[in-house]
Amino acid sequence: NWSNSNTFVEYNSNTNCSTVVLHRTAIATYDHKNEALKLNSGGYTTNTTKSRLNAILSEIFVGACVFQKNFNWFFNYNNQTHDFNDGMIITEGGVM
């Protein structure tokens, strides 16, 4: 269940996408057809946003995570680390 007081999931049957919303910000959108996940902090690089993104990632791409070092966010998957960028798209093959 991905719903609580400040986080919920919306499914759009027209696009076949599920979107996780935190405080009115779409932080992740999963395209079920293409098996791709779009990440977005909405400019809120907080522990809560990072925690929600990591919870989503752990369900879809095992071993993927967002982490912070020296106040900067990074994304790690398949032993590759990338700068975290709003709008980055993750697939089984890595970052697009």
Report the location of each language-model feature:
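Terminal leader/tail segments of proteins
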Residues: 1-96
